Swiss-Prot record:
Designated name of the protein: 3-dehydroquinate dehydratase
CDD domains associated with the record: DHQase_I
Biological-process GO terms, alphabetical: 3,4-dihydroxybenzoate biosynthetic process; amino acid biosynthetic process; aromatic amino acid family biosynthetic process; chorismate biosynthetic process
Active site: 143 (proton donor/acceptor), 170 (schiff-base intermediate with substrate)
Name of the gene encoding the protein in the UniProt record: aroD
GO MF, one annotated term: 3-dehydroquinate dehydratase activity
Catalytic reaction(s) noted: 3-dehydroquinate = 3-dehydroshikimate + H2O
Stored PROSITE patterns: DEHYDROQUINASE_I
């Protein structure tokens, strides 16, 4: 498996990298979160644009993104608009989803962009090409907030993302119990041993899935998500405690 360099942060080797989401709804809330990040030891920052109240005004998204970039300096930024069907804050037409992502890629303010697998393949391929032309890495993702699919299905989705040209692949699923968490970890381990050509991210949500967020170095997941203030998904730990746990795991391996 090859590693991926996102503004100096190497995914796919060593301790899983910690990504912290910005989930403010207003410019005021985002500024408060950005100030918090100055004292937080995360590796990447995810701007969850679907939380932003003015997200349908692309110019305002660009303006707030510029503020984020200026404040975070060289910290890698992942831009994400998570659709409602995959657990995000709002639904938009597919045309707007593509237009927003295209325009944000071209700002040169981001280092990576999240593209959801379950879109029209033609649109996905176009976004990947534009991103790669602008030296923006593609994190292709799938989120199931209702269930944990069978192991083979999760692997199939991750492999499909690789085949489409994603630099990093990601799947997050909802467990109904500990058996579902084991299924996710099995899929993760199989991906690491048999199929992964690029770094990948997996997680099982809610409290019962928390073990998947801290065991990436064992099973293969390259990135884990930790909250600075408000979590963007069920089961997220705070960055400080997450980093401490990851280091404990690393030191005993």
């Amino acid at each position: 498996m090859k590693t991926v360099n996102i503004r100096g942060v190497i995914l796919g080797e060593g301790i899983p990298k910690v990504c912290t989401p910005l989930v403010g709804r207003s410019l005021k809330e985002l500024r408060e979160e950005i100030n918090l990040l100055k004292d937080i030891d995360c590796d990447l920052v995810e701007f969850r644009a679907d939380f932003f109240e003015h997200v349908e005004n692309i110019q305002k998204v660009k303006e707030v993104l510029l503020e984020i970039r200026e404040a975070l300096k060289e910290k890698p930024i992942l831009f994400t608009f998570r659709s409602a069907k995959e657990g995000g804050e709002r639904e938009v037409e597919s045309e707007f989803y593509c237009k927003l992502n295209k325009e944000i890629i071209k700002t040169k303010l981001i280092d990576a962009i999240d593209i959801e697998l379950f879109n029209e393949e033609e649109s996905i391929l176009e976004l990947i090409k534009i991103a790669h032309d602008e030296d923006v890495k593609v994190v292709m993702s799938n989120h199931d907030f209702h269930k944990t699919p069978p192991k083979e299905e999760m692997i199939s989705r991750l492999v499909k993302m690789q085949e489409l040209g994603a630099d990093v692949t990601k799947i997050a699923v909802m467990p109904k119990g500990s058996s579902d968490v084991l299924t996710l970890l099995e899929a993760t381990n199989d991906m690491k041993i048999k199929y992964a050509k690029t770094p990948f991210i997996t997680m099982s949500m809610k409290g019962v899935g928390m073990i998947s967020r801290i065991s990436g170095e064992v099973f293969g997941s390259a990135v884990t998500f930790g909250a600075s203030k408000k979590a963007s998904a069920p089961g997220q730990l705070q960055v400080k405690e997450l980093k401490e746990i990851l280091n404990v795991v690393h030191n005993v391996l």
